[in-house]
């Protein structure tokens, strides 16, 4: 079925997506325009409780600021005052988190705005890069591109280890913490590189992305099942996460540059195995963490993993029924009139009722994938 006709040929799925997306625009986004926004700090609170009150602040993270910058950048032209909010978040990223002495960005500040965890971590820098690429695409301001370039420079000069991979964490002055590479920050770096390439030509970024994926295949792919492990092969106490398998699959399958790569072939081969081990066939719930020997390490159901599985399904062949089934599961199990449930336990009981500021990023990228799927 041609993509352009999906919305016409699947009125039930289209109506369901319209309802879910309306909930996002009418319920979830306003939470972060109103009660989730600390106007004094010009930062989002880390989380809201079920009554939409901010949890008492312990810290503010640069990564959370960057994810909300992506969120409101994506809403420019769709939601009133999204551009003003994105501009405020961009300013706050620099004002609160940028390290003027050593370069790069701190992990977190305390409730008064003083640097708290001053380490430099790849996960944070990847999201700053990702958010700035999307924001620059919308506003084309030179200052935004200069921050994008600064983030790319820091990643290449400070985090890179010369083998296609990157340190997960460094000290404030860029000295080694012997962290080594970890899957999740590297995935978000790949996502950030793809975002950069979607808004401009950049040969250095393209080469870095290809080298990263080549190194991921070599260092992280389990040779038997072709799943991506969370730590490099041979590390003690290793595991894999179905949500991350699905997230990687979407990034690779949706990229003409990476589709057909060896890493893509591995994730393609592992997809059915990941579904079989990591998704409850009755409820569609995605399990959080698995051992290779089939033992669930953590059977918690998290909304972000549900969103990533749903987004990945939009790129699978003959997936119309499963896309609709998973969208219904997301709506029925995780969305509610006041927002969303972040986690359910193995029995399906709600185990986390607060709503973190970082989750709308996952929903926004999922819904973007669904909108493209429906044409």
Regions found by a protein language model. Give the residues of each.
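Glycan-recognition and catalytic cores of secretory/periplasmic carbohydrate-active enzymes
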Residues: 1-375
